[in-house]
From Swiss-Prot:
Location, primary (coarse class): cytoplasm
Protein name per its UniProtKB record: Arginine--tRNA ligase 1
Keywords: Aminoacyl-tRNA synthetase, ATP-binding, Cytoplasm, Ligase, Nucleotide-binding, Protein biosynthesis
Organism in which the protein naturally occurs: Bacillus anthracis
One GO biological process term: arginyl-tRNA aminoacylation
Keyword Cell membrane part of the UniProt annotation: no
Catalytically driven reaction(s): tRNA(Arg) + L-arginine + ATP = L-arginyl-tRNA(Arg) + AMP + diphosphate
GO cellular component, one term: cytoplasm
Entries under CDD domains matching the protein: Anticodon_Ia_Arg, ArgRS_core
A GO term, aspect molecular function: arginine-tRNA ligase activity
Gene behind the chain: argS1
Source taxon at top rank: Bacteria
C-alpha cells in the first residue's frame, strides 16, 4: 500500500471509530465509507457523505450527525490538520501534508513497481483484440483497437490482474479461400500461364510478389501438382505470409500477443461439434426449415439465430460460440473482447450463447472501438496520398511515429469517435499532448543531470520536510494519486484515464518548474530534497507512459 492509500485508510478507520464513539450506529450498521477527492481543493483533500448515509439509521439530521462525527474524530491519528462541515452535511478533511513527504522515498524505492496495486487479486483475464482478417494490411480502426487493447492489458497487469493477450485468426472463411485462389493466380501468371484472378480476389502488389517468389523457388511444381495439394499449399503459404506481415507491424507498434488462436483449429479439434452437443443437451437449439437454430431470444436477443444453414454450412456465430466456450474452458475468470463499432449488434447474441452454455453472461465484457478520422492541413484525409487507398497502420507509423499514435489512440474513451490531427501529432508544441508529457520527462531528466553536477546524487540524509511550497505540495498530491488512478481505471476498463493522468502530472510539473528555482546552489539541503522529488516525478511519469506504450525520452 502507498502512503496516500494508507492515509485514506486511516481516515476511514477514524470515521468508523467516530460513528461508534458517538453511538450513531452499531458496527454492523456502518455503511461503506466513501472518500472522494474534491476537484475544488478549497473543499479539502478528501470529502465524505457519511453523515447523509447514516441519517436513516441514526434518525437525526445529517448536519447534526456530521457535527457529532467531527467532535469524535481523532485528527492526529489520520494526519488531518482541520475538518469542516459543508452544505447539508458533507465532511471535508484538510491534511497536514506531513504524509506527503513520505511519498518521495516510497516512489523512488518502488521504481517501476510504483503504481502497482492488488485490485485484480490475480483474477485471470483474457483480452482478445485486433483479430483482423489475415488478408491485408491493418487499417486505422485496427490500429486504435490495438492501442486501446494493449494499454488496457498493461493497465490490468499493473493493477494485479493475470492478463493474457489473444489474437483470433479468422483463417477458416471465404477470405482465406479467396487469398489462396489469388496466390494461385499470381503464381500461374508469374510462370507465364493464363489464370484469371478470382472475382473477390486480392489485387495488391504483395500478392504479385508472392506469386513471383513461388515461381522462382518452386518453378512449375505446384502448377502440375494435385489440385487439393496445390490448393492447401497456396492457402498455407499466403496465410503464413500475411500473418508474418501482421505480426511485424504489430510488434513495430509495440503490441505482442501471448496467444495466436486459429479458427481452423476449432474444426480440426472437434470444438464446434462439442459446443453444439452441449447446446443440444441443454435444449438450447431446435430444427426448423431444414436449419438448426439457437434459442437466443430466451436470453434477451431480439430474435433466434441460425447456427447451421439448410445447406449444412455454419453461420459466423457457430465457430464464435465454440471459441468462447474454449476460452472459458481454459479457466479465465473474465473475457474482454475489443470489437469495432460495426460489431455492436453482435453483443446480445454472444452473451446469450455464454448463458446458454451454462456460464454467467457477465463473464464476457465487450469494449467497442469507434472509427478514426484523419485530418491533415485542417482537412479530412480519406485516402493515402501515396497509395490512393485507405491509410494503414504501417503508413501512419511512418508519418507520425509510434509514440504519437499510441498516445492519441488511447487518450479518448474507445467508444467515442476520434479525430486524429496528423499535424498536431508531429508538432513540437504544448498543444501536442504526447510532446507535452514527454517534454516534462525530458525536463525532469535535465534537472537531475544538473543535480548530479551539484553533487546531489551522492546519497546521505535527505530532509523531505523542506518540500512544503504550494507548488511542491500540488506535485506531491498528484504523484500520490497514481496508484488510485491505476486501480480505478483498471476496474472500470478506462485506459484513457492514464493518458489523462500523464498529461495532468506533466502540467503540474511544468507549473512547479515555472514557479520555482528547482535547484539552488545556495541552499543545497532544499535542493537535495527537490532532487529526490524530481526522481519521484521521473519514476511516476515513466510508469504512466509505459502503461500507454509510449517512450519516456531523457532529452528532446
Amino acid at each position: 500500500m502507498n502512503s496516500l492509500e494508507q492515509v485514506k485508510g486511516l481516515i476511514k478507520e477514524e470515521i468508523q471509530a467516530a460513528v461508534l464513539k458517538a453511538e450513531l450506529a452499531t458496527e454492523e450498521q456502518i455503511p461503506n465509507v466513501v472518500l472522494e477527492s474534491p476537484k475544488d481543493k478549497t473543499n479539502g483533500d478528501f470529502s465524505t457523505n457519511m453523515a447523509m448515509q447514516l441519517a436513516r439509521v441514526a434518525k437525526k439530521a445529517p448536519r447534526m450527525i456530521a457535527e457529532e462525527l467531527v467532535a469524535n474524530f481523532d485528527k492526529a491519528k489520520a494526519s488531518t490538520e482541520k475538518i469542516e462541515i459543508a452544505g447539508p452535511g458533507f465532511i471535508n478533511f484538510y491534511m497536514d501534508n506531513s504524509y506527503l513527504t513520505d511519498l518521495i522515498p516510497t516512489i523512488v524505492n518502488a521504481g517501476e513497481a510504483y503504481g502497482e496495486t492488488n485490485t485484480g487479486k490475480g483474477e485471470k483475464v483474457q483480452v482478445e483484440f485486433v483479430s483482423a482478417n489475415p488478408t491485408g494490411d491493418l487499417h486505422l480502426g485496427h490500429a486504435r483497437g490495438a492501442a486501446v487493447g494493449d494499454t488496457l492489458c498493461n493497465l490490468l497487469a499493473k493493477a494485479g490482474y493475470d492478463v493474457s493477450r489473444e489474437y483470433y485468426i479468422n483463417d477458416a472463411g471465404n477470405q482465406i479461400h479467396n487469398l489462396a485462389l489469388s496466390v494461385e493466380a499470381r503464381y500461374m501468371q508469374a510462370l507465364g500461364l493464363e489464370k484469371e484472378m478470382p472475382e473477390d480476389g486480392y489485387h495488391g502488389a504483395d500478392i504479385i510478389g508472392i506469386g513471383k517468389r513461388l515461381a522462382e523457388e518452386f518453378g512449375d511444381r505446384y502448377a502440375k501438382a494435385d489440385e487439393k495439394e496445390s490448393y492447401e499449399f497456396y492457402r498455407e503459404y499466403g496465410l503464413k505470409y500475411e500473418l508474418a506481415k501482421l505480426q511485424k507491424d504489430l510488434e513495430s507498434f509495440r503490441v505482442k500477443f501471448d496467444v495466436w488462436f486459429s479458427e481452423t483449429s476449432l474444426y480440426k479439434n472437434g470444438k464446434i461439434d462439442q459446443a453444439l452437443a452441449v447446446l443440444k443437451e441443454r435444449d438450447e437449439i431446435f430444427e426448423e426449415d431444414g436449419a438448426t437454430w439457437f434459442r437466443s431470444m430466451t436470453y434477451g436477443d431480439d430474435k433466434n439465430r441460425v447456427l447451421i444453414k439448410n445447406d449444412g454450412s455454419y453461420t459466423y456465430l457457430t465457430p464464435d460460440i465454440a471459441y468462447h466456450r474454449d476460452k472459458l474452458e481454459r479457466g479465465f475468470d473474465k473475457l474482454i473482447n475489443i470489437w469495432g463499432a460495426d460489431h455492436h449488434g453482435y453483443i446480445p447474441r454472444m452473451k446469450a450463447a455464454i448463458q446458454a452454455l451454462g456460464y454467467d453472461k457477465e463473464t464476457l465484457e465487450v469494449e467497442i472501438i469507434q472509427m478514426v478520422q484523419l485530418y491533415q492541413n485542417g482537412e479530412k484525409m480519406k485516402m493515402s496520398k501515396r497509395t490512393g487507398k485507405a491509410v494503414t497502420l504501417r503508413e501512419l507509423m511512418e508519418e507520425v511515429g509510434v509514440d504519437a499514435m499510441r498516445y492519441f489512440f488511447a487518450m479518448r474513451s474507445g467508444d467515442s469517435h476520434l479525430d486524429f490531427d496528423m499535424d498536431l501529432a508531429v508538432s513540437k508544441s504544448n498543444e501536442n499532448p504526447v510532446y507535452y508529457a514527454q517534454y516534462a520527462h525530458a525536463r525532469v531528466c535535465s534537472i537531475l543531470r544538473q543535480g548530479e553536477e551539484l553533487g546531489l546524487a551522492t546519497g546521505g540524509d535527505v530532509n523531505y520536510k523542506l518540500v512544503t511550497s504550494e507548488k511542491e505540495v500540488e506535485l506531491l498530491k498528484k504523484l500520490g494519486e497514481f496508484p488510485a488512478v491505476v486501480a480505478d481505471a483498471a476496474q472500470k476498463r478506462l485506459p484513457h484515464r492514464i493518458t489523462n493522468y500523464a498529461f495532468e502530472l506533466a502540467a503540474t510539473l511544468h507549473s512547479f518548474y515555472n514557479a520555482e528555482k528547482v535547484l539552488n546552489q545556495d541552499n543545497l539541503e532544499l535542493s537535495k530534497a527537490r532532487y529526490e522529488l524530481m526522481k519521484a516525478v521521473r519514476t511516476t511519469l515513466q510508469n504512466a507512459l509505459a502503461i500507454v506504450g509510449v517512450s519516456a525520452p531523457e532529452k528532446m
